[in-house]
Amino acid sequence: MARTRVRIPAVLALSAALFLTAGCGNDASSTSGEGQDQPRTGKPSVVVTTTWEGAFAKAAGAEDIKVIVPQSVHHAPDYDPKPSDLAAVAKADFVLYAPFEPYAAKIKEAAGSKAKLVEVELDNDPAKVSAEVGRLAGLFGTADAAAQWKTGFDAEYTKLNKDLQAAWPGGSSPSVVTQVFTAWSAKLAGATTVGTYGPEAVTPAQLAELSAKKPSLVLDNAHMSTGTVLPDSGAKQVKIVNYPGDDLDLLPVYRNAAAELKKAMGTP
């Protein structure tokens, strides 16, 4: 996602209206910040900024998950929180956010929540996903559920990786240029990354440098696309989606990326 500044006046304006609601919440909400580094007992209430954090939370074993920013909002920083959003934060045990989403702290402050703020590293690289899911499970007290999810995830990832390698044109790993936040999809395909770009716009110098590497594929971030990245290079551009759907399931993100990559490599 783009690192954009966020407008938060709506959050601050609504905080006064929710002051009494937050102040009258149950004791669990007011003490949820205690023992923050210790595993929990019972199932936590989790508020997440987007479906990406939500999918990590679900994979870790959380069940009571509230997503603040609807999937239909292309740029999450453009979203103005509603009173119901702030009320949910006031009752949460955990609030998950990414470091490029500074409004998460403002939401927590405005709602008067005692929830634990948890910064999540959003990257679909399998090693990073496994590490984050395991860390969250430790906080939530849901290690068994997370371990079960990881078993299924590892099996599906291995299958997709083998399928994509079997689809390599001429049996050789394709050379790719990838946006920095879609590098995980190059790894999924077993592709050879010859260059990266973004999140800033590609400069003329970068355009010349990347085109000279003669990639067969360009992996573009669907959430930050600026159009054709390497025009006249002959490379096929593949749109990669990072964010899960409203079902908060990470696996379709990998399946969809694999389908797009196979199509670009000439395999239906």
Cite the ranges covered by each PLM segment.
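Extracytoplasmic "Venus flytrap"
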Residues: 31-33, 39-60, 68-80, 223, ...
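Alpha-helical, coiled-coil/dimerization segments enriched in small aliphatic residues
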Residues: 61-82, 182-208, 239-250
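Structured C-terminal subdomain patch of bacterial secreted/periplasmic proteins
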Residues: 44-45, 128, 213-268
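Extracytoplasmic substrate-binding proteins
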Residues: 109-176, 248-268
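Acidic/His-rich segments in extracytoplasmic proteins that coordinate ligands and/or metal ions
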Residues: 64-143, 227-235
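Basic- and aromatic-lined ligand-binding clefts that recognize polyanionic substrates
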Residues: 46-48, 53-57, 145-198, 202-210
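Short, low-complexity, disordered segments immediately C-terminal to signal peptides
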Residues: 7-16, 24-45
